[in-house]
Amino acid sequence: MFSSVKKIIQDAKRGKIFILVDDKNRENEGDLVIPASKIDHKKINFMATHGRGLICLAIDKNKAKALNLSLMPSRNSSRLETAFTISIEARKGVTTGISAKDRAHTIKTAIKKNVRSKDISTPGHIFPLIAKDGGVLQRAGHTEAAVDIAKLSGCGSSGVICEIMNADGSMAKGKHLINYAKKFNLNIARIEDLIAYRLKKESLIKLKRIEQVKIGKSDTYQVKIYENKLDGKEHIALIKTQ
C-alpha cells in the first residue's frame, strides 16, 4: 500500500511528484511533494488543479536567512507551529505572480545558490516554510520531510508541497489518499517511515573533542565529549585508561 522511502528518493531524483502522509495523531493528511529544483509550470499546475491546497516552498534556515525572510507571525500560536514566513514573489520575470509559470519562476529564483533578498519581493504568491534543522527527527511535518527528501536525493535542500483536498473541499485522508495515488500513478509514503529510515542510516551524535584527565594519584581517564545533533546538548563518556 505504501512505498518505501528508497522508492520516494528515486522519484525525487527523477523529478516525479510523490505523496507524503503524516501521522494519524497529527494532521493525518497527504501532501504532494517534489524537490524545488525539479519544479516547473506543469507540476505547479498539477498541484493547483489536482492537489487544491496551498502551494508552499519548504526551505532550511540558511535559505530563509539569505532571503531575509521573517516569520509571518512574531509569535507562532498555530497548533503544529508551522513556520510560515511572509509570502514571496520573484522581483523580475513575472506578471501578476499567480500563474503556474510565474509561481514556478518564483520558486526557481528563490532556490538559486547565490540568491539575495533583492531578488524577491514581498508579499507574493509563494509561501515559504522554514524546516527545523533536525528535519523529521525534530519535527514530523511535511515541511521537514520535503527538505529531508530533497537532501537525501541530492536535489538541494528545498521542496515544494501542496495539501491534497477532495473534490468537495474536505481534506483527503486514508483510503481517499490511496485511491488518489492510484488514480494519478503516484507513489505514497509515510513520514514515520522516513523517520525510521534516517534513524537507521544516520548517527545522531558527533564527537566534539577528547581530553585526558587524572583523578587521584594514578588513575587516568579519557573524556569523550559528544554533541546531540538535534538539540545541541553535550554528553560525556568517561573511560579509564590506566
Question: What role is predicted for each listed range?
Answer:
Residues M1-Q242:
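Catalytic domains of riboflavin
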